């Protein structure tokens, strides 16, 4: 593909930068907690981006989109992540919406896609379970057919944003006797349905992001089955292709490496600038090169999507490469920052803005 951006693409970047300067506080670092005021700010930014049509710009107009290029959508995702802008519901916008366009019924598309485009709804993902993580196909949550519904019982865990979510997309086992990849179905579930219990999982620094979800006789209408019964694995795999295909990995990594480079160029240790250490320079340069590789992989994936190609193996490559890259940057960041890396986010004299990586 041609990696040269059009003038209109660069103009769009400038438009996004102007929006960020206008809507974000002057001292914005990208760090938000889970307070009600933080969530309200997230929703406020989401609504403004939705009003601009940015959440769904590459979608068909009939579902709330602008039919813009996929590459333009990639630029939006990159700039939002690089600038640590809140508000974009990746579960709905990046993962579920394109999956519904492939596997959903017309009724499902018309019911859910416009709400996502307008920024009116928060989704969460019901995949991992206490006994099934990496081996997702070993999931045990059951969905039993009963009249016009399926009745769901089981548990999901590590569910991000479930305490804020209106809806969940999930996989459940509909045929326990079938081979494990064949007896799974994909559902859309109302988080306020009777029998849904959300339990907070508080991490070691006191943050609430993950949850455990218990389902006790939760009724899901058959119209909320996405794709064919017992073939939900393929729907879920499509969704994972979209989840893994994002440019977010390289964008967030690029922001952190630039901050580490600035810190190294400005900070003395043992009488010398940190950046004068040839080992540090080499490691920073190597990671900066790998970030550009990750970025180009994401652009290639975006190009494939623009040609109507589902980037199956390419998405997995991008996910593994991007995640490992972030881990390398976090490790180097801790080495460069030293004891500064142990400071709490609330500490007044943090040398770098708070980040998900360092």
Question: Can you say where each PLM-predicted feature lies in the sequence?
Answer:
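C-terminal helix-coil-helix/basic helical segment that borders enzyme active sites and/or dimer interfaces
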Residues: 28-36, 269-278, 292-347
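A short core secondary-structure module
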Residues: 148-149, 153-199
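Glycine-rich beta->alpha junctions and the first turn(s) of the following alpha-helix
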Residues: 3-7, 196-293
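A structural signal for short hydrophobic beta-strand segments in well-ordered beta-sheet cores
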Residues: 141-144
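Conserved small/polar residues in nucleotide/adenosyl-binding loops
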Residues: 348-354
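Intrinsic disorder at enzyme termini
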Residues: 1-8, 344-347
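A short, Trp-centered hydrophobic/proline-enriched beta-strand micro-motif
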Residues: 119-127
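Internal helix-loop-helix
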Residues: 50-119, 161-167, 291, 305-313, ...
């Amino acid at each position: 593909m041609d990696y040269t951006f059009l003038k209109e693409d660069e103009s769009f970047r400038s438009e996004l930068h102007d929006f960020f300067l206008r809507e974000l506080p002057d001292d914005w670092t990208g760090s938000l907690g889970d307070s009600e005021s933080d969530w309200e700010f997230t929703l406020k930014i989401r609504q403004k981006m939705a009003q601009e049509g940015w959440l769904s710009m590459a979608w068909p107009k009939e579902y709330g989109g602008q039919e813009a290029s996929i590459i333009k959508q990639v630029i939006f995702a990159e700039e939002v992540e690089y600038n640590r802008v809140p508000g974009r519901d990746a579960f709905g916008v990046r993962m579920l919406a394109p999956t519904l366009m492939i596997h959903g019924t017309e009724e499902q598309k018309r019911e859910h896609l416009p709400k996502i485009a307008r920024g009116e709804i928060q989704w969460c993902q019901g995949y991992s379970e206490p006994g099934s993580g990496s081996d997702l196909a070993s999931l045990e949550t059951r969905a039993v057919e009963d009249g016009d519904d399926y009745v769901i019982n089981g548990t999901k865990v590590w569910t991000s944003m479930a305490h804020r979510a209106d809806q969940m997309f999930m996989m459940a086992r509909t045929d326990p006797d079938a081979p494990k990849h064949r007896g799974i179905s994909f559902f859309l579930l109302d988080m306020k349905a009777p029998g849904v219990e959300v339990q907070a999982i508080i991490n070691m620094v006191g943050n609430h992001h993950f949850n455990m979800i218990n389902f006790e006789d939760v009724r899901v209408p058959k119209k909320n089955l996405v794709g064919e019964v017992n073939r939900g694995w393929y729907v879920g795999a499509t969704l994972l292709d979209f989840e893994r295909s994002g440019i977010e990995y390289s964008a967030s990594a690029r922001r952190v490496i630039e901050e580490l480079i600035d810190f190294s160029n400005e900070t003395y240790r043992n009488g010398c600038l940190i950046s004068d250490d040839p080992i540090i320079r080499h490691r920073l340069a190597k990671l900066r090169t790998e970030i550009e590789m990750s970025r180009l992989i994401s652009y290639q994936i975006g190009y494939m999507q623009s040609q109507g190609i589902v980037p199956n193996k390419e998405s997995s490559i991008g996910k593994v490469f991007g995640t490992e890259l972030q881990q390398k940057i976090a490790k180097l960041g801790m080495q460069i920052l030293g004891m500064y890396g142990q400071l709490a986010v609330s500490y007044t004299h943090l040398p770098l803005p708070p980040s998900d990586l360092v």
